[in-house]
Amino acid sequence: MQHNTLSKHNQKLPFTRYDFGWVLLCIGMAIGAGTVLMPVQIGLKGIWVFITAAIIAYPATWVVQDIYLKTLSESDSCNDYTDIISHYLGKNWGIFLGVIYFLMIIHGIFIYSLSVVFDSASYLKTFGLTDADLSQSLLYKVAIFAVLVAIASGGERLLFKISGPMVVVKVGIIVVFGFAMIPHWNFANITAFPQASVFFRDVLLTIPFCFFSAVFIQVLNPMNIAYRKREADKVLATRLALRTHRISYITLIAVILFFAFSFTFSISHEEAVSAFEQNISALALAAQVIPGHIIHITSTVLNIFAVLTAFFGIYLGFHEAIKGIILNLLSRIIDTKKINSRVLTLAICAFIVITLTIWVSFRVSVLVFFQLGSPLYGIVSCLIPFFLIYKVAQLEKLRGFKAWLILLYGILLCLSPLLKLIE
C-alpha cells in the first residue's frame, strides 16, 4: 500500500488544459501595463543595476512564492486563507492574519476597480461610442462591476475561456514588440558602470521594483484551493499547484526579460529620461520604428486586457478573503455547515459590487494604497510564512536557509517606502 502511494506521488503528471488555464491566469495577474514601463526604469538606473537587482530579486521572488504556496498546501483544511491559518493556529490567529491578507488583496482590487471604470469610460468616449463620460454614471459603474463579478464568480473554467485569450494576446504583443526592436539594438546604449555607492543604492531600490514585475501571489491560494477541491489526494494537488507555479513563473520571467532587454538595447539613457518625464511607456518609444496607429491600437488593447485579466485574477483572492473572514466570525456563534453556500456566495458578490461602486464613486486617492502595497506584500508573502514555518510543527520541513531568505526579503519590502527617501 505504501509502495503504491509513493509510486503515485512520484509518477509523471500529465499537463492538462485545466493546468494551462491556471498558467494563463497566473501570467495574466503579473504581466501587463507595468511591464511596458520596465525598459524606461532600466534606462534610468542603468543596465548593470537592473541585472544585479534581477539576479537577486527574481530567484528570491520564486522562493517566496514557492514557500508561500507550500505553507498553505500543507493544511488538512483548505477552504480559504483564514481557514488554513485557523487550522494551524486557531480561530483568533486565523481572523487576525486573515484581515492582513484581506488588506493586501483589497489594495490591488481597489486600484484595478478605478482603472476598470475610468479607463473603459475614457475609451468608449475616445472611440466615439458615447458622447458622455460614463464614469460619472452610477448605473454604468454598477453594470460594469456586476458583469465582471458574475464572470469571475462563474468558476475557473469560465475564467479560463474569457481571461485566457486576453493573456495570450498580451504576451503576444509584448513578444512581438521585443522582436521588432532587435534590428535597432545599439550596444553603445549600455551605460558605464556607476559609482559603488550609487550602484548599491540603486540596486536596493530596484529589487522591490523587480519583485512587483513578477509577483502573482494574489492568485496562488485560490489556485491551491481549486486543486485541493479537484484532487482528493492532498500531495497530488500540491504537486500540480507547484508545477503550475513553476511553469508560469519561468514563462513570465523569460517574456519580461526578453522584452526589457530588447528595448533597453534600443534606447539611450537620454530617451529613457525623456520618457520618464513625459510619463510614457516603452511602446510610445517604439513609435520611432513602428507606425503610430499600430502603437495606439496595441497600447489600448494591452491596457484593457491587462486591467481585466488582473482584476479577474485578484478577484478570486478577494472573494476568498471575504468568505474566510465571514465564516470565521460566524463559526463562533453558529454551525457553519448549516450556512447555504450559494446564498453566501451571492451575498458576497453583491457586497463586492456595492463596495467597489462606492469606492469608485468617491474617487478616493490610491496614493496611500501604493505606499502600503509593498509592506502588505512583504508581511503576507514573507513574514507570515516565516512565522508559520517556525510556529507550526507540520511545517518543520520548510525550515532552513530559504525560510531566512524570505524573512530578509520581507523586511526589505516592508522598508521599501522608506528606502525611497534615500534616492
UniProtKB/Swiss-Prot annotation:
It is found in: Cell inner membrane. Pfam families: Trp_Tyr_perm. One of its GO terms (biological process) is amino acid transport. GO terms for molecular function: transmembrane transporter activity. The chain crosses the membrane at residues 20-40, 44-64, 94-114, 134-154, 162-182, 203-223, 247-267, 294-314, 350-370, 372-392, 403-423. Keywords: Cell inner membrane, Cell membrane, Membrane, Transmembrane, Transmembrane helix, Transport. It is a multi-pass membrane protein. One of its GO terms (cellular component) is plasma membrane. Its main location: membrane. Residues 1-19, 65-93, 155-161, 224-246, 315-349, 393-402 are cytoplasmic. Residues 41-43, 115-133, 183-202, 268-293, 371 are periplasmic. Belongs to the amino acid/polyamine transporter 2 family. SdaC/TdcC subfamily. PANTHER family: INNER MEMBRANE TRANSPORT PROTEIN YHJV, SERINE TRANSPORTER. This is Inner membrane transport protein YhjV.
